[in-house]
C-alpha cells in the first residue's frame, strides 16, 4: 500500500494493484521449490512402459468448479470474501483416490474372460487386497513421520501396481476393455491403477523425501519455528497442486457400478486423508510463504484487538507485540500497552484526510484509534507508520487477533494460568477476558488498589494473556493436529477475527485472495455490504452489544441491477444488576448506554439508499474510497431499546452474484 493513496481526494486503497494470484504466485519469490526425486527410477520407468501399451488414454487436465451462495448473517458473525471461491466438502472429496474401487471393479469382470480371465482376475483381486494393506501402511507411516517405514510401504505398493498394470496390458485384457458394459469397468480399473501410480510417484515419494530431509522434530527451534522447515512443506504442497488437478480430471472419468458405492465408501476416508492437508492449505500457501519469506529478516506487529472496546475494524488495540523472522527462525515477542508501542499521533506519511476525520470522527488523529475505520488495510498502515515513528524500525505488515482466537488457541494447546491465579481455557477465555476480569477488579472491588492501579493491573493481565497464549501455541504445537490449526485459521478469516496486512503490494494481494485482508469491498462482481459499529465512549460495554442483520431476497430492477432490503438491529443486552455493580471504567458516562458510531457501506459499484430508523436517528450519506456510505457518529443504544435501521442496497449493473454482508465481529455467541 502506498502512502500517497491517502490524499484528500480519497483515492482507492490499492486500486491499481489487482493481481491474479494464480498466475503470479510463483514469480518473484526469493526461494525456489525443493525438488524431489524418487530412488526407484528403474522400476518406475518399467511400470510406465507397461502402461503405455494399455488403453488408458486419459489426458491430464484441470477441473475447477465454484458455486455462489446466498448469505444471511446474524449474531454479529460475518464472512469476508475476496471473490475466490472455496471448494465445498463434496468437491474436495472428488479429489480423493478410491483405491478400493479396484477391488470392486475386478469383481465385475470375473467370469467374463473364461479360465484365463478368471485366473487373472483372482490374481488382481489378491493384488488389490494387498494394495489396501500397503496403502494403510503407507498412510500410517506418513502421518507418523516415519520416513523409513513409508519408503518400505511405497516400494511394496509400486510392486503391486506393477503386477496389476502388467496383467491389464495383456492382449486378453485389452480385448476385455472393448466388451460392452464390462469394458468401461476394465478401463476404470486401469485409470484407478494409474492414479495409484501418480499418487506414489508425484505425492508420496516427494512427501517422504521431505520428511526425511526436514523431520518435524526440527520445526521448533528454541521459542520459535524453523523457516526452512516450514518452507520445505509449503513447497511440497505447492508442488503437488497440478498433480491433484490431474487426479481430479481422471476421477471424473471413472465409471463403476452404483451398487459398489457402499463397499468403496468404507475405505474412502483413509484415502481422503492423503489429500486433506493439501485441500485445507490450498488457499493459504502463497500467503504463508509471503509471511515467513525465505528466512531473511522480517518484522510484523501483532495487534490484540479488544472486542469489549469494539471498533469497526475489530477492537481497541490494547496490547501490541511483534513477530520476527531472524536468522531463519520465526518467533513471537512480548506484548506491551499500545501507548508504549505506537506514537501518539500518526506521522505525516499516514496522510489522514479531512474526509476520514469527518466520516470516522476526529479521534482518528490518534494512532491507537485508527480502527474506527472499518478498512483494516488503512488502520494497519497507520499503526505500522506510528510504530516506525516511535521506534525507528519499519515493519513488513500487521497481524490482528481478537480474544476469540485466544480461546480457540487454548482449546488446542491447553489452559494457561494468569498471575492472579485465573485459569483460561478453551471454554472460558472470552468470557473471562471480556467480562469477568473487568467486574472482578473494576467494580465492587476489595482489592486494596485504587482505580489507576486496578486499571494498570488489568491491562497487565491482558498483556500476560497474549504473551502466554502465543507461548503455549509455540511450545505445544503438534503437527499431528495441523488440521485443527487450519480450522482455527479458517474460522478466524471467515469471522474477520484474524486479519493480515502487508506493506508489499503483491503480498497484500495474497491476503486479499485468502480473504483475510479486512479490506472494504472492491470487486463489483462479488458484492459485499458492510455493517460496522464502534464504541466511542471509553467503556467496556462491547460484551453486551448485539449486531443482527436481515436481508431480503433480491428484486431485479429494469436496468438489470439487484436491490436488497436490509435491516440492522443494534441491541444492548446489559441488565440493571450489571449496571449497579459496574464502575465508570466499565460503564462510561451513559449509565450503561452504548454510545458509538455506525457505518453502513454499499458494495463496490453499488448504491445505498432509503434509510429508515425506529427513533428518528439521522443517517448521513457520503462516499469513501469510491464506496457509498451511510453513517451516524453520535448514537446511543440504550438497554431494552434497540436501534433499528432499514435501508436498500443495490448491486452494480450486470452482477447476479448474491450480496453478502460483513459485520464487525461481536461477542454475542460467547455470552
Protein language model regions, located:
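N-terminal targeting leaders characterized by basic, low-complexity, disordered sequences
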Residues: 1-85
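N-terminal Sec-pathway targeting helices
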Residues: 88-106
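Non-catalytic, solvent-exposed segments at the cell envelope interface
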Residues: 94-97, 112-670
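Short conserved active-site loop signatures built around small residues
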Residues: 106-112
Amino acid at each position: 500500500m502506498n502512502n500517497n493513496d491517502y490524499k484528500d481526494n480519497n483515492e482507492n486503497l490499492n486500486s491499481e494493484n489487482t493481481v491474479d494470484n494464480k498466475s503470479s504466485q510463483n514469480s518473484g519469490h526469493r526461494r525456489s521449490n525443493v525438488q524431489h526425486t524418487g530412488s526407484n527410477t528403474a522400476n518406475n520407468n518399467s511400470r510406465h512402459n507397461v502402461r503405455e501399451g494399455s488403453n488408458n488414454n486419459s489426458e491430464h487436465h484441470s477441473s475447477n468448479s465454484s458455486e455462489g451462495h446466498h448469505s444471511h448473517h446474524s449474531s454479529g458473525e460475518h464472512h469476508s470474501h475476496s471473490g475466490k471461491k472455496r471448494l465445498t466438502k463434496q468437491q474436495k472429496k472428488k479429489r480423493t483416490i478410491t483405491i478400493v474401487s479396484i477391488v470392486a471393479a475386478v469383481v465385475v469382470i470375473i467370469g467374463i474372460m473364461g479360465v484365463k480371465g478368471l485366473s487373472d482376475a483372482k490374481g488382481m483381486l489378491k493384488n488389490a487386497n494387498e494394495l489396501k494393506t500397503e496403502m494403510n501402511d503407507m498412510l500410517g507411516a506418513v502421518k507418523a513421520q516415519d520416513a523409513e517405514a513409508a519408503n518400505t510401504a511405497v516400494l511394496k505398493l509400486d510392486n503391486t501396481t506393477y503386477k496389476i498394470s502388467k496383467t491389464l496390458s495383456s492382449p486378453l485384457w485389452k480385448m476385455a476393455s472393448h466388451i460392452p458394459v464390462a469394458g468401461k469397468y476394465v478401463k476404470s480399473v486401469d485409470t484407478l491403477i494409474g492414479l495409484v501410480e501418480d499418487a506414489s510417484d508425484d505425492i508420496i515419494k516427494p512427501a517422504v523425501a521431505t520428511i526425511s530431509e526436514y523431520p518435524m522434530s526440527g520445526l521448533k527451534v528454541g521459542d520459535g519455528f524453523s523457516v526452512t522447515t516450514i518452507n520445505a512443506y509449503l513447497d511440497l504442497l505447492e508442488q503437488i497442486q497440478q498433480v491433484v488437478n490431474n487426479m481430479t480430471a481422471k476421477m471424473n472419468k471413472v465409471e463403476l457400478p452404483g451398487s459398489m458405492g457402499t463397499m468403496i465408501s468404507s475405505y474412502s476416508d483413509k484415502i481422503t486423508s492423503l489429500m486433506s492437508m493439501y485441500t485445507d492449505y490450498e488457499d493459504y500457501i502463497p500467503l504463508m510463504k509471503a509471511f515467513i519469506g525465505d528466512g531473511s529478516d522480517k518484522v510484523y506487529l501483532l495487534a490484540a484487538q479488544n472486542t469489549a472496546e469494539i471498533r469497526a475494524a475489530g477492537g481497541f488495540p490494547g496490547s501490541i507485540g511483534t513477530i520476527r523472522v531472524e536468522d531463519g527462525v520465526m518467533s513471537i515477542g512480548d506484548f506491551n500497552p499500545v501507548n508504549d508501542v505506537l506514537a501518539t499521533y500518526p506521522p505525516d506519511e499516514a496522510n489522514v484526510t479531512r474526509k476520514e476525520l469527518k466520516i470516522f470522527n476526529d479521534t482518528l488523529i490518534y494512532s491507537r484509534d485508527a480502527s474506527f475505520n472499518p478498512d483494516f488495510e488503512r488502520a494497519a498502515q497507520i499503526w505500522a507508520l506510528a510504530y516506525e515513528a516511535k521506534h525507528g524500525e519499519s515493519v513488513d505488515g500487521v497481524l490482528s487477533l481478537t480474544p476469540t482466537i485466544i480461546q480457540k488457541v487454548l482449546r488446542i494447546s491447553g489452559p494457561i494460568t494468569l498471575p492472579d491465579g485465573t485459569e483460561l481455557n478453551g471454554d472460558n477465555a472470552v468470557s473471562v477476558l471480556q467480562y469477568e476480569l473487568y467486574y472482578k477488579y473494576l467494580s465492587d472491588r476489595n482489592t486494596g488498589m485504587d482505580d489507576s492501579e486496578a486499571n494498570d493491573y488489568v491491562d497487565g493481565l491482558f498483556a500476560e494473556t497474549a504473551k502466554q497464549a502465543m507461548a503455549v501455541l509455540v511450545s505445544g504445537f503438534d503437527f499431528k493436529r495441523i488440521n485443527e490449526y487450519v480450522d482455527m485459521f479458517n474460522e478466524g478469516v471467515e469471522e474477520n477475527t484474524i486479519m493480515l496486512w502487508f506493506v508489499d503490494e503483491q503480498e497484500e494481494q495474497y491476503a486479499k485472495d485468502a480473504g483475510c485482508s479486512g479490506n472494504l469491498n472492491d470487486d463489483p462482481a462479488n458484492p459485499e455490504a458492510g455493517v460496522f459499529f464502534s464504541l466511542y465512549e471509553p467503556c467496556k460495554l462491547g460484551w453486551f452489544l448485539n449486531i443482527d442483520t436481515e436481508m431480503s431476497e433480491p428484486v431485479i430492477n429494469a436496468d438489470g441491477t439487484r436491490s436488497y432490503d436490509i435491516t440492522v438491529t443494534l441491541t444492548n443486552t446489559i441488565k440493571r444488576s450489571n449496571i449497579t455493580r459496574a464502575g465508570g471504567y466499565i460503564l462510561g458516562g451513559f449509565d450503561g448506554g452504548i454510545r458509538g458510531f455506525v457505518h453502513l457501506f454499499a458494495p463496490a459499484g453499488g448504491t445505498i439508499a432509503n434509510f429508515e430508523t425506529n427513533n428518528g436517528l439521522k443517517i448521513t450519506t457520503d462516499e469513501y474510497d469510491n464506496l457509498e456510505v451511510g453513517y451516524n457518529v453520535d448514537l446511543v443504544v440504550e438497554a431494552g431499546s434497540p436501534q433499528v435501521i432499514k435501508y436498500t442496497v443495490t448491486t452494480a449493473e450486470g452482477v447476479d452474484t448474491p450480496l453478502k454482508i460483513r459485520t464487525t465481529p461481536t461477542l454475542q455467541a460467547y455470552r
